[in-house]
Amino acid sequence: MSEEKKVVLTREYVVNLRRAYEVSRTKRAKYAVGLIRRFVARHLKVESKNVRIGQALNEVLWMRSIEKPPRKVRVVVEKLSDGTVKVDLKNV
């Protein structure tokens, strides 16, 4: 039987993705996903492999193709009881 995962911590961040524009155009959106993973892992003290990116956030990052991700995004981060972290787009 699987145990119910409870939310231990919830935070909101504005992640600046400006550094993604320092990478070549054909790698920017993928690099932006990595930037978010590393940012969240650093701030919540978990490994980056335990960070899960939500579908809505992923679609926003890739919406204007691989060459033009957004400059910054507002995210909601939830740390679960099993140590994984969910990152989703903040509903405005």
Swiss-Prot record:
Lineage: Archaea, Thermoproteota, Thermoprotei, Thermoproteales, Thermoproteaceae
GO-annotated molecular function: structural constituent of ribosome
CDD domains: Ribosomal_L31e
Domain of life: Archaea
Name of the protein in question: Large ribosomal subunit protein eL31
Annotated organism of origin: Pyrobaculum arsenaticum (strain DSM 13514 / JCM 11321 / PZ6)
Gene Ontology biological process: cytoplasmic translation
Listed Pfam families: Ribosomal_L31e (PF01198)
Entry-linked Gene3D superfamilies: 3.10.440.10
InterPro entries: Ribosomal_eL31, Ribosomal_eL31_dom_sf
Protein family (similarity comment): Belongs to the eukaryotic ribosomal protein eL31 family.
GO annotations of cellular component type: cytosolic large ribosomal subunit
Keywords: Ribonucleoprotein, Ribosomal protein
